[in-house]
Amino acid sequence: MRRGFKSEAERLADRVRTQIGLRSDAPPDIRQLAAHLGVEVIDAQILVGMESLRELESLQPGAFSAATFHLAGGRTVAVYNPCNEPARTKSDIAHELAHVMLGHEVRELQQIGGHAFFTCNPEQEEEANWLAGCLLLPRELLLHHAYAGADAQALAATAGVSVPMARFRLNTSGVLLQARRSRTTRGSGRP
């Protein structure tokens, strides 16, 4: 990831949260965020049918989570796989919205075994993953949970995300270390 991106992503997530009228510790309703960004969110089964999605999932598990399309007339559509759990779907949509917010280019479409797939720019995917986490789990919310000693499961339940997503944000954001240092400082009697 490019230098400074993680801090930039936190600020961008905070800015968009403010724009839609949320507190700094409030995770957004992902569809409200999509509407704010002018992105339509569509269930893939409307386009290809559930049987086709299940067939793809059986042929290559996890091959399709979500994808964003920039259509004629300036229309932007995020299509998600309804076969996934709701918490995963929320993360997938947030990931696609992150691509839009960051102005990432549409990936190249390729055919593999009769199925169309997008190739991924690894750096853009990493950035979108990080920003999606910032959108779904604001740093202020992470701090609140870390200082309270709450675990990833409690955070996931509060924010409606998966436990792996909550664990990822807690572990990579630095809030656990910050809370631990704060407790150590208070316990030692130092200011």
Which sequence ranges carry the predicted segments?
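Active-site hotspot residues in diverse enzymes, especially metal/ion-binding acidic/histidine motifs
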Residues: 1-191
